[in-house]
Amino acid sequence: RQRSEYVLEVLGITDLEGIPAGGLSHGSARLVGLARALAAQPKYLIMDEPAAGLNEHEVPALLAALAKVREETGCGMLLVEHNVGLVAQACSRVVVLAAGSMIFDGDPQAALNDEGVKSAYLGDAAFGGGH
């Protein structure tokens, strides 16, 4: 019980306690799902697009919560995410895949400036070309 209360507090969703799942918004339901996973005190947490469906207030809260949990527990986190801004804020290491191959492994800021990453995801638009 104590761990559950801690996780709800860290995620900023103590007000959702006791609300039936069917009464939650999509974003709130995702945060409750994350809380459920964190309550189990995992060694590693794998998340597929954790910010999907969250509103503009929930995303910063999610980022702050993940940073706090990582700092306090040492829980390793793997995110599968297409939101480059979120990745740059939340991650200390980025692996970029394109067409089934790894094209980058390193610092998030370096990934944003990597010509191979730009080319793979922006095509000619990354270099001022295009039609």
List PLM regions with ranges.
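Glycine-rich phosphate-binding loops of nucleotide-dependent enzymes
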Residues: 1-131
